[in-house]
């Protein structure tokens, strides 16, 4: 593990392999350990760099104070890539990290060679939301879903809150199916969810999607339900240089559930 001083914060990161740089941005309740299952394939012929965002493990944050805001994390990601001094990178973002990566691609396309967005998290402006799916404000991936889970954590029911979040994304019983290591990672980052409810995340707009200039691969899990696949399809339909790949037999955590299939679609895209 290395650290890099970014915007007055020591950002921890993994740095493995040699070659073209790939930077991976993790999602909610995750950290650089989220990428363990794909470290080998992604770093075989590339330099893989996976940071933990501000207030995630290895920091043990209690959810109070600090600067846990979406705009802060976007600024941190931009500064991190700049301070690496490697020139344009291939940027992979999953879930909340996909939202961060999307915004980096909008604000600083000069820093991006190619962009991979694995079910980017967030909501849609009305100009992107299909009419027949307008009742998803309470479902998986919504702010209400995060709020329900964080309220249980704040009340002292740590496992109950984490279970509600994971089961809400991946379906009933998903928490029980996690390995002990995956559960521990969520527990280590549980209190970030308290701040995530009011992080100031902006909805995606049609103008945002149309302005995304880097070549972008949207990756989804075939079994994902709720708002996430709707967001993916809406963004991919309007981004000018977009491709889409759907991973069979996988849900929202597709790169952990089907790591080989994930790498088989991502690596050829990055190599082209």
Language model segments and positions:
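Catalytic histidine neighborhood in serine/cysteine hydrolases
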Residues: 236-252
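Conserved acidic catalytic loop of the alpha/beta-hydrolase fold
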Residues: 71-89
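Conserved serine/cysteine hydrolase catalytic core
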Residues: 181-237
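Catalytic histidine-centered segment of alpha/beta-hydrolase-like enzymes
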Residues: 250-263
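Conserved alpha/beta-hydrolase catalytic His-Asp/Glu region
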Residues: 153-194
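Flexible "cap/lid" loop of the alpha/beta hydrolase fold
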Residues: 102, 106, 113-153
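Gly/Ala-rich beta-loop-alpha elbow adjacent to hydrolase catalytic centers
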Residues: 93, 97, 101
């Amino acid at each position: 593990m290395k650290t890099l001083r970014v915007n007055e914060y020591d950002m921890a990161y993994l740095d493995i392999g040699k070659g073209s740089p790939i930077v991976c941005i993790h999602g909610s309740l995750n950290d650089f350990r989220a990428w363990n299952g794909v470290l080998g394939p992604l770093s075989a012929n590339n330099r893989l760099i996976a940071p933990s965002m501000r207030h995630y493990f290895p920091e043990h944050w209690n959810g109070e104070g600090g600067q846990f805001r979406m705009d802060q994390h976007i600024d941190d990601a931009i500064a991190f890539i700049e301070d690496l001094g490697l020139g344009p990178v291939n940027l992979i973002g999953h879930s909340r990290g996909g939202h961060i990566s999307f915004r980096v691609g909008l604000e600083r396309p000069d820093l991006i060679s190619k962009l991979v967005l694995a079910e980017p998290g967030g909501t849609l402006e009305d100009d992107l939301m299909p009419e027949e799916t307008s009742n998803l404000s309470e479902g998986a991936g919504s702010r209400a879903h995060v709020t329900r889970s964080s309220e249980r954590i704040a009340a002292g029911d740590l496992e109950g809150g984490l279970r509600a979040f994971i089961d809400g994304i991946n379906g009933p019983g998903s928490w029980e199916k996690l390995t002990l290591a995956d559960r521990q990672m969520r527990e280590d980052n549980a209190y970030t969810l308290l701040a995530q409810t009011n992080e100031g995340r902006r909805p995606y707009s049609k103008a945002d999607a149309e302005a995304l200039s880097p070549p972008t691969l949207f990756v989804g899990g075939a079994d994902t339900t709720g708002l996430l696949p709707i967001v993916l399809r809406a963004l991919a339909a309007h981004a000018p240089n977009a491709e889409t790949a759907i991973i069979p037999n996988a849900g929202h955590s597709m790169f952990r559930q089907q790591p080989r299939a994930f790498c088989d679609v991502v690596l050829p895209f990055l190599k082209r």
